[in-house]
Amino acid sequence: MINKLKNPFDPSFGALPQIILPNYQSDFESPTSVAQAIAYDDPNRVIVITGLRGSGKTALLTQIEQQVVKLPNTYVVEIDNNQRMVQNFGHNLKNIFKMHTLTDKIASISVMGFGLSFNKTNEDYTTQDIENFMTMLRKLNKRVVIFIDKFNHKENTREFIQLLQNLKRHNLNFYLVADGLPKMIYDIEHDQTLTFPEMSI
């Protein structure tokens, strides 16, 4: 009988995990290559980092963000999935327009059919407001990269992913880079009502 060596880096001391997920990072050699894929408008809109606790997921997410923030015409948005994610996203988009003086450029672009709301509080932003912001960013040839640390499967997460499904359906320019434990990512990917993560990962 062959005595197999146990992996010293596995806190379960060699026990097989209940869930085995494919390596979604396998196409990328480094954080820089992830940023390059985004810069070249890679059609894969979701990049997921998964692994055991303490495996360096957050550190890798941070390294990717540091590379992405250097890209031209790209805005980074950090979303806390313990808060109201849709409203938080809307507030971040409003700040992009204000901080980067994009409001000065809006006048020269047709906005027939919708308006942009800059005076709302976090709680007041709707999915329509967000679609309007994102539509304007597309007209300005800008992209948004959303970063979420410790992604999990909760009601506010479901609401946020449903919003992303709508944004993708309207061909709006965004990417999602997230990290999470294997069980959490599995639950999100296999939620029957959320087709966007499964199609994108």
Where are each of the predicted segments found?
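A short, basic N-terminal segment
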Residues: 1-44
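Short amphipathic C-terminal alpha-helix that caps PH/PH-like domains
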Residues: 31, 89-93, 164
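Hydrophobic core positions within the conserved protein kinase catalytic domain
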Residues: 35, 134-137, 164
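The catalytic "switch" region of P-loop NTPases
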Residues: 2-16, 142-145, 156-201
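Amphipathic coiled-coil/heptad-repeat helices and related helical stalk/stem segments
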Residues: 31, 126-130, 160
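Glycine-centered flexibility sites
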Residues: 23-24, 51-56, 180
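Generic, ordered loop/turn and secondary-structure boundary motif
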Residues: 14, 22, 117-119, 186
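P-loop NTPase nucleotide-binding core
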Residues: 40-146, 150-155, 172-174
